[in-house]
Amino acid sequence: MPYSIPLLRPNPADPVPFYRLPHLIHTYSHLPTRAISHDDASMAYYSPAPIGCNLTEGFERRIEREDEEEHLDGLVESLEWLITRGRKGERKGGIITWRGMLTRLITMPYETRDPWEMTAIALDGSVYLELWDPPEEKAKRKREQSAWEKQGYMGYAYESFSTIPQEGRPGNGPEGWGGDVNTNVQWANVVRSAIGEIPLCIAGEVDCVKAEPGSPNPGLSGCMELKTNKVIQHPGHEAMFHKKLLKHWAQSWLLGIPEVVVGFRDDDGILRSQTTFDTAKIPYLVEVLNKPSWSPNRCLQSLHSVCSFLTKNVLPTDPLVTYPHIRGNRQAVKEAGELPPAVVWRLAFDPKKGCELHAVGEVGVVDGRWGGMLKEEYVRWRMGLE
């Protein structure tokens, strides 16, 4: 097994792979306790935030979720929930991951500052991909973010001012306030898609839907993303915003969300204006500039290149391929005394060097997680041992 494999950069002249329109297969909610409920309990309804609202509202009352590593738990639990009820889950031969991982892959050609690493393992015909986030990196990021804590909070406050929760607005806050921020609460969509010939199964948080409060889930066509940005005052601000639109487009395009609403605030956190963008048209807004800062074609080539790279190298190390007799064979596992180990891979990106994949080695069950990633009971179910 090769230790390290560099990823060749895609040729801009190569054909642009097609990104298949996402198909919604499941939704689930994180409740105020962070527990998962397989329904739309945390789905919120869009209601435009009042211009002039203060996005520092409720900062001292916010509830932040514990910094615990959840890996791919919500996504894989959803797949098990679907399949055990006779519904379709992922398509084999592809990648199962969070929307945030694919956002990093699709924007990679234009990332000039931040390196990252991801962990990949193969199981039951799919590559599971998540961020490799060691404790020292988490601590460093937390220190850096503490200086911008209030600015980061403004995005959550904008969501509160822009949405009506299932239980309605509290009634004791300022105009439009949807309730104090609790970052435990999230509503997520799980979709099937594909980049070229490679199947994708993606989950990601969705901010709200465009529908009458109290009405049922309208599906992907009614989903919306909410973002904040500083008021654009000069060409430098405008150039920065056009670069920011790359991430806004990628996040929404990958999950099939048709609209992005951006609230523009001043330095004091006062909302001055807001604009709705059609996700599919965002690339054209940038394309017409004299010097476009990014191209969706290069992004799609990048995504396909990395996904192809991963499936080609990681899928053959699936233990159900290398140890086919294990599937459904409880006796063999009992005699071995443990599950066959996962072959763990690390995908590393450095803006100056590019991307490479290297094999970390075989990892069994560590603290209840196979390969350090997937819960043991989920792996046993996938292997037909439950």
Curated annotation (Swiss-Prot):
InterPro entries: RAI1, RAI1-like_fam
GO biological process, one term: NAD-cap decapping
SUBUNIT field: Interacts with RAT1; the interaction is direct, stabilizes RAT1 protein structure and stimulates its exoribonuclease activity. The interaction also stimulates RAI1 pyrophosphohydrolase activity, probably by recruiting it to mRNA substrates.
GO cellular component, one term: cytosol
GO MF term set: metal ion binding; mRNA 5'-diphosphatase activity; nuclease activity; nucleotide binding; RNA binding; RNA NAD+-cap (NAD+-forming) hydrolase activity
CC cofactor: a divalent metal cation
The protein's name in its UniProt record: Decapping nuclease RAI1
Main localization, broad class: nucleus
Its job: Decapping enzyme for NAD-capped RNAs: specifically hydrolyzes the nicotinamide adenine dinucleotide (NAD) cap from a subset of RNAs by removing the entire NAD moiety from the 5'-end of an NAD-capped RNA. The NAD-cap is present at the 5'-end of some RNAs and snoRNAs. In contrast to the canonical 5'-end N7 methylguanosine (m7G) cap, the NAD cap promotes mRNA decay. Also acts as a non-canonical decapping enzyme that removes the entire cap structure of m7G capped or incompletely capped RNAs.
First-level EC class: hydrolase
Amino-acid positions noted as binding substrate in the UniProt annotation, renumbered to this chain: 34, 205, 227, 251
Short name of one Pfam family: RAI1
Organism: Cryptococcus neoformans var. neoformans serotype D (strain JEC21 / ATCC MYA-565)
Reaction catalysis annotation: a 5'-end NAD(+)-phospho-ribonucleoside in mRNA + H2O = a 5'-end phospho-ribonucleoside in mRNA + NAD(+) + H(+); a 5'-end (N(7)-methyl 5'-triphosphoguanosine)-ribonucleoside-ribonucleotide in mRNA + H2O = a (N(7)-methyl 5'-triphosphoguanosine)-nucleoside + a 5'-end phospho-ribonucleoside in mRNA + H(+); a 5'-end triphospho-ribonucleoside in mRNA + H2O = a 5'-end phospho-ribonucleoside in mRNA + diphosphate + H(+)
Family: Belongs to the DXO/Dom3Z family.
Domain of life: Eukaryota
Binding residue positions for a divalent metal cation: 159, 207, 225-226
E.C. designation(s): 3.6.1.-
Organism placement in taxonomy: Eukaryota, Fungi, Dikarya, Basidiomycota, Agaricomycotina
Cofactor: how and how many bound: Divalent metal cation.
Protein localization: Nucleus
